[in-house]
């Protein structure tokens, strides 16, 4: 029969174990604290326009404000179409790092807000990121488990026969049931460092999900703005085609009366064909844009609902010359890179601890008797306490090279973190400049479109009165058509710059699922 040596029960043994466990508070390896590398402010860079140009842009802004009180006369191109609504007064961006940049501050179109909610709820990439969070949360829980004693229960039954020297063999039955405890004392912090690394992995994937959501919201808003731009472009092309058709009919009437040549008529026909061709082009692009937006929504290709006009989709903002660098530091991609670096630093500690002795304690307690009905009686009590020390002496360089690899990975992640910060600064600077200078471009484009609208109206009246040639009308209408398309494109680019600014500063979508 297997024998177990009885040892005196003493509370001193547990006191010793508790004292040894306190020594595990130390942890080898570098600190996981990270010094932020973001500057105190994020600059927009040197202003791209000289002071004289700035004075000119300011004068255009004042002129546009005065023009709103006296609408320009309509040309034949603009007759019958809804008036062009200017972009509203921009709001001031909050530069306080404690301010939560919410997308709901700038998304004014309820239809766009609904589309974003649908995308957040349905997008497969976001579902993948959220599933990874659950995966790494479980892995973190598994990494924390070794902090605690591992308890197992065992039961066995056997029939034994042993031979004794000079005697008859002995047969006996043995039934035992024991509870076993094993505990690795985290003297060097190997388990602690592993749990830290798992926690940083979890935080990294949480930031990855935030980055996926941030990109998704930005992409939906950008695609929707482009869709609304195509709607406006189609409206302009159709209005221009209809107006050109009216002028063409007038030219044909004059040709029939012998007042103009066939060349004039052919020129007008070519003029009308241009917006007609562009109309078909815009229709194709609009269908492709709806399909792209449907993909972001996690839905099959189909029609996309529309809200208000392009100018009302996004709230325009004004920005200062610089913003606090803390706005950059809270971007999810920057936070993710920081967490990856911290996880690598923690794994250096794991690799270092693997080269040091491992201290374990354990024991078992149970009962062993020949008959099952006599288990757990005082006569069958068995128990033991053990302590072990394991020291790696020769591993063929495996542990040393694992430590070297961990340090190299930490250097890699540190460089990646620094590169991510530089990329974030560049994107923020580009977005700041895009918003600031996009406003100037928009004002100039609005001024051009208004001036050409007046010029086209004058040219049409002069041609109808017979005091000017068809070339004057053709030139004025073509210039107006191009200016109107450019204005819509600039409006879309300006509002998209606002979207990119919120993305560059790590804006949050607080309307998720609501």
Regions found by a protein language model. Give the residues of each.
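Terminal intrinsically disordered/low-complexity segments used for targeting and assembly
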Residues: 2-6, 10-121, 175, 199, ...
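Gram-negative outer-membrane beta-barrel proteins
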Residues: 28-30, 36, 159-165, 187-189, ...
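Sec/SRP-type N-terminal targeting helices
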Residues: 127-128, 144-145, 185-213, 263, ...
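Transmembrane beta-strands of outer-membrane beta-barrel pores
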Residues: 135, 157-161, 185, 297, ...
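Hydrophobic, lipid-facing positions within transmembrane beta-strands of outer-membrane proteins
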Residues: 175-183, 223, 323, 383-387
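Periplasmic alpha-helical coiled-coil/stalk elements that build and connect Gram-negative outer-membrane
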Residues: 191, 200, 207-323, 434, ...
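A short glycine-centered flexible hinge/capping loop motif at secondary-structure junctions
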Residues: 255-259, 463-467, 504-508
């Amino acid at each position: 029969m297997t024998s177990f040596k009885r040892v005196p029960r003493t509370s001193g043994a547990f006191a010793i174990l508790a004292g040894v466990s306190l020594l595990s508070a130390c942890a080898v390896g570098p600190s996981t604290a990270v010094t932020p590398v973001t500057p105190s402010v994020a600059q927009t860079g040197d202003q791209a326009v000289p002071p004289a140009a700035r004075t000119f842009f300011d004068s255009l802004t004042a002129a546009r404000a005065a023009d709103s009180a006296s609408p320009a006369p309509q040309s034949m191109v603009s007759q019958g179409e809804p008036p062009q609504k200017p972009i509203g007064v921009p709001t001031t961006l909050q530069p306080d790092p404690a301010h939560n940049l919410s997308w709901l501050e700038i998304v004014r179109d309820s239809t766009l807000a609904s589309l974003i909610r649908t995308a957040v709820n349905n997008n497969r990439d976001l579902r993948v990121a959220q599933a990874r969070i659950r995966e790494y949360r479980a892995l973190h829980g598994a990494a924390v488990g070794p902090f605690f004693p591992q308890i197992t229960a065992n039961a066995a039954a056997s029939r034994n026969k042993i031979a004794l020297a000079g005697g008859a063999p002995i047969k006996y039955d043995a039934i035992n049931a024991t509870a076993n405890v094993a505990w690795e004392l985290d003297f060097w912090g190997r388990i602690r460092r592993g749990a830290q690394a798992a926690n940083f992995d979890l935080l990294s994937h949480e930031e990855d999900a935030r980055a996926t959501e941030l990109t998704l919201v930005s992409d939906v808003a950008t695609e929707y703005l482009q869709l609304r731009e195509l709607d406006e472009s189609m409206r302009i092309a159709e209005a221009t085609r209809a107006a050109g058709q009216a002028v063409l009919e007038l030219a044909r009437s004059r040709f029939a009366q012998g007042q103009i040549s066939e060349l004039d008529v052919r020129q007008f026909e070519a003029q009308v064909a241009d917006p007609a061709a562009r109309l078909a082009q815009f229709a194709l692009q609009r269908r492709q844009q709806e399909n792209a937006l449907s993909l972001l929504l996690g839905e099959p290709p189909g029609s996309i609902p529309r809200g208000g006009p392009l100018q009302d989709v996004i709230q325009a903002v004004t920005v200062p010359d610089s913003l606090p660098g803390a706005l950059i530091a809270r971007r999810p991609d920057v936070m993710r890179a920081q967490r990856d670096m911290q996880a690598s630093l923690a794994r250096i500690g794991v690799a270092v601890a693997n080269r040091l002795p491992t201290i374990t304690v354990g024991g078992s307690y149970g009962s062993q008797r020949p008959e099952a009905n006599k288990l757990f009686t005082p006569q069958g009590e068995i128990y033991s306490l053990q302590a072990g020390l394991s020291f790696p002496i020769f591993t063929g360089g495996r542990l040393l090279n694992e430590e070297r690899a961990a340090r190299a990975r930490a250097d890699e992640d540190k460089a990646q973190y620094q590169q991510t910060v530089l990329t974030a600064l560049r994107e923020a600077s580009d977005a700041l400049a895009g918003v600031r200078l996009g406003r100037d471009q928009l004002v100039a484009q609005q001024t051009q479109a208004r001036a050409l609208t007046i010029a086209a109206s004058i040219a049409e009246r002069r041609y109808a009165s017979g005091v000017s040639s068809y070339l004057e009308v053709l030139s004025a209408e073509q210039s107006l058509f191009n200016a109107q398309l450019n204005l819509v494109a600039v409006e879309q680019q300006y509002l998209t710059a606002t979207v990119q600014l919120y993305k560059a500063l790590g804006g949050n979508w607080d309307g998720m699922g609501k």
